Protein backbone atom coordinates (compact mmCIF):
# COMPACT_ATOMS: atom_id res chain seq x y z
CA UNK A 1 0.00 0.00 0.00
CA UNK A 2 1.38 3.38 -0.98
CA UNK A 3 0.15 6.95 -1.26
CA UNK A 4 0.09 9.22 -4.27
CA UNK A 5 -0.86 12.89 -4.47
CA UNK A 6 -2.91 14.80 -6.99
CA UNK A 7 -0.34 16.98 -8.79
CA UNK A 8 -2.71 19.98 -8.75
CA UNK A 9 -4.35 19.90 -5.32
CA UNK A 10 -2.00 17.66 -3.36
CA UNK A 11 -4.97 15.49 -2.34
CA UNK A 12 -3.88 12.06 -1.16
CA UNK A 13 -4.86 8.86 -3.00
CA UNK A 14 -4.28 5.38 -1.56
CA UNK A 15 -2.71 2.98 -4.06
CA UNK A 16 -3.49 -0.65 -3.12
CA UNK A 17 -3.13 -2.96 -6.15
CA UNK A 18 -3.55 -6.10 -4.02
CA UNK A 19 -7.23 -5.27 -3.60
CA UNK A 20 -7.75 -6.46 -7.18
CA UNK A 21 -7.31 -9.97 -5.77
CA UNK A 22 -10.37 -9.78 -3.49
CA UNK A 23 -12.75 -12.74 -3.92
CA UNK A 24 -16.10 -11.84 -5.44
CA UNK A 25 -18.71 -14.13 -3.91
CA UNK A 26 -21.34 -12.55 -6.15
CA UNK A 27 -19.48 -14.11 -9.08
CA UNK A 28 -19.29 -17.60 -7.59
CA UNK A 29 -16.30 -17.53 -5.25
CA UNK A 30 -16.80 -19.47 -1.98
CA UNK A 31 -17.63 -17.29 1.01
CA UNK A 32 -14.56 -16.83 3.25
CA UNK A 33 -16.69 -15.46 6.09
CA UNK A 34 -18.82 -18.54 6.77
CA UNK A 35 -18.17 -20.94 9.69
CA UNK A 36 -15.74 -23.61 8.58
CA UNK A 37 -13.80 -21.18 6.39
CA UNK A 38 -11.90 -19.52 9.22
CA UNK A 39 -8.57 -20.56 7.67
CA UNK A 40 -9.46 -18.41 4.64
CA UNK A 41 -9.04 -15.26 6.73
CA UNK A 42 -6.07 -13.93 8.72
CA UNK A 43 -5.96 -15.04 12.37
CA UNK A 44 -8.86 -13.53 14.26
CA UNK A 45 -8.46 -10.60 16.62
CA UNK A 46 -11.50 -11.45 18.72
CA UNK A 47 -14.86 -13.18 18.59
CA UNK A 48 -18.16 -13.07 20.42
CA UNK A 49 -19.85 -16.33 21.36
CA UNK A 50 -18.83 -19.98 21.21
CA UNK A 51 -19.57 -21.01 18.54
CA UNK A 52 -18.94 -17.51 17.29
CA UNK A 53 -21.70 -15.12 16.24
CA UNK A 54 -19.37 -12.14 15.61
CA UNK A 55 -15.79 -12.42 14.43
CA UNK A 56 -13.10 -9.76 13.91
CA UNK A 57 -9.90 -10.21 11.89
CA UNK A 58 -7.46 -8.15 9.80
CA UNK A 59 -8.49 -7.46 6.22
CA UNK A 60 -6.53 -9.78 3.92
CA UNK A 61 -6.69 -7.12 1.20
CA UNK A 62 -6.20 -3.92 3.21
CA UNK A 63 -6.41 -0.43 1.71
CA UNK A 64 -4.12 0.79 4.53
CA UNK A 65 -1.83 -0.74 7.14
CA UNK A 66 -4.63 -0.96 9.72
CA UNK A 67 -7.82 -2.45 8.32
CA UNK A 68 -10.22 -4.89 9.99
CA UNK A 69 -13.30 -6.89 9.04
CA UNK A 70 -16.16 -7.40 11.49
CA UNK A 71 -18.29 -10.37 10.41
CA UNK A 72 -21.55 -9.63 12.17
CA UNK A 73 -23.26 -13.01 11.99
CA UNK A 74 -22.32 -16.63 11.39
CA UNK A 75 -25.31 -16.99 9.06
CA UNK A 76 -24.42 -16.29 5.44
CA UNK A 77 -27.81 -14.78 4.52
CA UNK A 78 -28.40 -12.82 7.73
CA UNK A 79 -29.30 -9.12 7.66
CA UNK A 80 -28.53 -6.41 10.18
CA UNK A 81 -32.19 -5.54 10.69
CA UNK A 82 -32.94 -9.22 11.39
CA UNK A 83 -30.43 -9.56 14.25
CA UNK A 84 -31.74 -9.99 17.79
CA UNK A 85 -31.52 -6.68 19.73
CA UNK A 86 -28.72 -7.92 22.00
CA UNK A 87 -26.79 -9.19 18.96
CA UNK A 88 -27.06 -5.84 17.14
CA UNK A 89 -26.04 -4.04 20.32
CA UNK A 90 -22.95 -6.21 20.63
CA UNK A 91 -21.98 -5.40 17.04
CA UNK A 92 -22.12 -1.67 17.81
CA UNK A 93 -20.14 -2.16 21.02
CA UNK A 94 -17.43 -3.98 19.06
CA UNK A 95 -17.30 -1.11 16.55
CA UNK A 96 -16.30 1.26 19.31
CA UNK A 97 -14.03 -1.20 21.08
CA UNK A 98 -12.03 -1.66 17.88
CA UNK A 99 -12.20 2.08 17.16
CA UNK A 100 -10.47 2.80 20.46
CA UNK A 101 -7.72 0.29 19.64
CA UNK A 102 -7.10 1.86 16.21
CA UNK A 103 -7.38 5.44 17.47
CA UNK A 104 -3.61 5.93 17.25
CA UNK A 105 -4.24 6.46 13.52
CA UNK A 106 -4.95 9.99 12.33
CA UNK A 107 -8.49 8.90 11.41
CA UNK A 108 -10.55 5.73 11.77
CA UNK A 109 -13.42 5.07 9.38
CA UNK A 110 -16.18 2.63 10.42
CA UNK A 111 -18.34 1.73 7.45
CA UNK A 112 -20.63 -0.85 5.90
CA UNK A 113 -21.10 -1.72 2.23
CA UNK A 114 -24.25 -3.85 2.00
CA UNK A 115 -25.15 -5.10 -1.46
CA UNK A 116 -23.32 -5.21 -4.75
CA UNK A 117 -24.35 -1.69 -5.78
CA UNK A 118 -22.95 -0.42 -2.47
CA UNK A 119 -19.50 -1.80 -3.29
CA UNK A 120 -19.60 -5.13 -1.45
CA UNK A 121 -17.81 -8.10 -3.02
CA UNK A 122 -18.97 -10.50 -0.29
CA UNK A 123 -22.69 -10.58 0.63
CA UNK A 124 -22.10 -12.14 4.07
CA UNK A 125 -23.07 -9.52 6.70
CA UNK A 126 -20.01 -7.51 7.71
CA UNK A 127 -18.59 -4.04 8.33
CA UNK A 128 -15.08 -2.64 8.12
CA UNK A 129 -12.74 -0.39 10.07
CA UNK A 130 -9.90 1.37 8.28
CA UNK A 131 -7.23 3.41 10.03
CA UNK A 132 -5.82 6.24 7.94
CA UNK A 133 -2.44 7.97 8.38
CA UNK A 134 -4.11 11.28 7.49
CA UNK A 135 -7.44 13.01 8.09
CA UNK A 136 -9.56 12.88 4.91
CA UNK A 137 -10.35 16.21 3.22
CA UNK A 138 -14.08 15.88 3.89
CA UNK A 139 -13.45 15.43 7.62
CA UNK A 140 -11.02 18.35 7.66
CA UNK A 141 -13.61 20.56 5.94
CA UNK A 142 -16.43 19.54 8.28
CA UNK A 143 -14.20 19.93 11.33
CA UNK A 144 -13.26 23.45 10.23
CA UNK A 145 -16.94 24.25 9.73
CA UNK A 146 -17.70 23.13 13.29
CA UNK A 147 -14.82 25.28 14.56
CA UNK A 148 -16.11 28.37 12.72
CA UNK A 149 -19.75 27.97 13.73
CA UNK A 150 -21.12 30.20 16.48
CA UNK A 151 -22.99 27.15 17.81
CA UNK A 152 -22.86 23.47 16.93
CA UNK A 153 -25.04 22.79 13.85
CA UNK A 154 -25.80 19.26 15.07
CA UNK A 155 -26.74 20.11 18.65
CA UNK A 156 -29.89 21.77 17.29
CA UNK A 157 -31.25 19.92 14.26
CA UNK A 158 -34.83 21.14 14.52
CA UNK A 159 -34.64 22.63 11.02
CA UNK A 160 -34.16 19.14 9.53
CA UNK A 161 -37.12 16.77 9.01
CA UNK A 162 -37.25 14.37 11.95
CA UNK A 163 -37.80 10.69 11.22
CA UNK A 164 -37.59 9.45 14.79
CA UNK A 165 -36.32 10.61 18.15
CA UNK A 166 -35.15 8.56 21.14
CA UNK A 167 -33.79 9.59 24.51
CA UNK A 168 -30.22 9.95 23.22
CA UNK A 169 -30.46 10.19 19.41
CA UNK A 170 -32.26 11.93 16.56
CA UNK A 171 -32.75 10.20 13.20
CA UNK A 172 -33.14 12.93 10.59
CA UNK A 173 -33.33 13.60 6.85
CA UNK A 174 -30.70 16.34 6.53
CA UNK A 175 -31.12 19.33 4.25
CA UNK A 176 -28.29 19.50 1.74
CA UNK A 177 -28.03 15.70 1.51
CA UNK A 178 -25.93 14.57 -1.44
CA UNK A 179 -27.95 11.41 -2.09
CA UNK A 180 -31.65 10.65 -2.38
CA UNK A 181 -33.10 9.28 0.89
CA UNK A 182 -29.88 9.99 2.79
CA UNK A 183 -30.27 10.01 6.58
CA UNK A 184 -28.23 10.90 9.63
CA UNK A 185 -28.41 9.46 13.12
CA UNK A 186 -27.15 12.21 15.42
CA UNK A 187 -26.46 11.88 19.16
CA UNK A 188 -28.17 14.59 21.16
CA UNK A 189 -25.17 15.08 23.43
CA UNK A 190 -22.10 16.82 22.02
CA UNK A 191 -19.60 14.13 22.91
CA UNK A 192 -17.01 11.89 21.32
CA UNK A 193 -18.04 8.72 23.14
CA UNK A 194 -21.22 6.94 21.99
CA UNK A 195 -24.13 6.78 24.40
CA UNK A 196 -26.47 3.83 24.77
CA UNK A 197 -25.21 1.37 22.11
CA UNK A 198 -28.48 -0.59 22.32
CA UNK A 199 -30.43 2.54 21.39
CA UNK A 200 -28.09 3.30 18.50
CA UNK A 201 -28.24 -0.31 17.28
CA UNK A 202 -32.03 -0.20 17.31
CA UNK A 203 -32.08 2.96 15.19
CA UNK A 204 -29.58 1.44 12.76
CA UNK A 205 -31.83 -1.59 12.42
CA UNK A 206 -34.87 0.62 11.82
CA UNK A 207 -33.00 2.60 9.18
CA UNK A 208 -31.87 -0.56 7.37
CA UNK A 209 -35.44 -1.89 7.34
CA UNK A 210 -36.64 1.45 5.94
CA UNK A 211 -33.92 1.59 3.28
CA UNK A 212 -34.83 -1.88 2.03
CA UNK A 213 -38.14 -0.40 0.82
CA UNK A 214 -36.09 1.79 -1.52
CA UNK A 215 -33.02 -0.23 -2.48
CA UNK A 216 -31.41 -3.61 -1.87
CA UNK A 217 -28.04 -1.90 -1.30
CA UNK A 218 -26.90 0.72 1.18
CA UNK A 219 -23.86 2.23 2.86
CA UNK A 220 -23.38 3.63 6.30
CA UNK A 221 -20.40 5.51 7.68
CA UNK A 222 -19.60 6.77 11.17
CA UNK A 223 -18.38 10.35 10.73
CA UNK A 224 -16.13 11.47 13.60
CA UNK A 225 -13.78 14.31 14.44
CA UNK A 226 -10.93 13.07 16.67
CA UNK A 227 -8.79 16.17 16.03
CA UNK A 228 -11.56 18.76 16.43
CA UNK A 229 -13.10 19.02 19.94
CA UNK A 230 -16.01 21.07 18.58
CA UNK A 231 -16.92 18.32 16.11
CA UNK A 232 -20.13 16.33 16.65
CA UNK A 233 -20.05 12.71 15.43
CA UNK A 234 -22.93 11.15 13.51
CA UNK A 235 -23.83 8.17 11.34
CA UNK A 236 -24.56 8.77 7.66
CA UNK A 237 -26.83 6.23 5.93
CA UNK A 238 -27.38 6.11 2.17
CA UNK A 239 -29.58 3.71 0.20
CA UNK A 240 -27.95 3.23 -3.21
CA UNK A 241 -30.55 4.24 -5.75
CA UNK A 242 -28.31 5.84 -8.37
CA UNK A 243 -24.80 5.40 -9.74
CA UNK A 244 -22.48 8.37 -9.39
CA UNK A 245 -22.07 9.59 -12.97
CA UNK A 246 -20.01 12.02 -15.01
CA UNK A 247 -21.52 15.24 -13.66
CA UNK A 248 -20.87 14.28 -10.03
CA UNK A 249 -17.39 12.95 -10.83
CA UNK A 250 -16.47 15.99 -12.90
CA UNK A 251 -17.79 18.70 -10.61
CA UNK A 252 -17.98 17.19 -7.13
CA UNK A 253 -21.55 18.52 -7.05
CA UNK A 254 -24.44 16.16 -6.40
CA UNK A 255 -28.02 16.17 -7.68
CA UNK A 256 -30.53 14.90 -5.10
CA UNK A 257 -33.82 13.69 -6.59
CA UNK A 258 -35.64 13.30 -3.24
CA UNK A 259 -36.44 16.36 -1.13
CA UNK A 260 -35.66 15.75 2.58
CA UNK A 261 -39.14 16.97 3.56
CA UNK A 262 -40.70 13.98 1.78
CA UNK A 263 -38.42 11.36 3.31
CA UNK A 264 -39.62 11.34 6.91
CA UNK A 265 -43.10 10.29 5.81
CA UNK A 266 -41.74 7.36 3.83
CA UNK A 267 -39.87 6.00 6.85
List PLM regions with ranges.
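Active-site microenvironments that recognize anionic phosphate/pyrophosphate groups
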Residues: 1-124, 130-195, 208-267
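Aromatic-lined carbohydrate-binding surfaces of glycoside hydrolases
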Residues: 205
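Gly/Ser/Thr-rich active-site loops/lids in small-molecule metabolic enzymes
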Residues: 198-202
Amino acid sequence: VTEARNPITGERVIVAPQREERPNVYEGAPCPFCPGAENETPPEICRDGDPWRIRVFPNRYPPTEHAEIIVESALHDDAFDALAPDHAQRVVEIYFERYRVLATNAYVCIFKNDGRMAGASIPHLHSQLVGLPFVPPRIVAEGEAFARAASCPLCDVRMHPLIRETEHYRWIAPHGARFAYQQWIVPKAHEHQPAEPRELASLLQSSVAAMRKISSAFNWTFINFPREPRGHWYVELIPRTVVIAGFEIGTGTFVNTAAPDTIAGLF
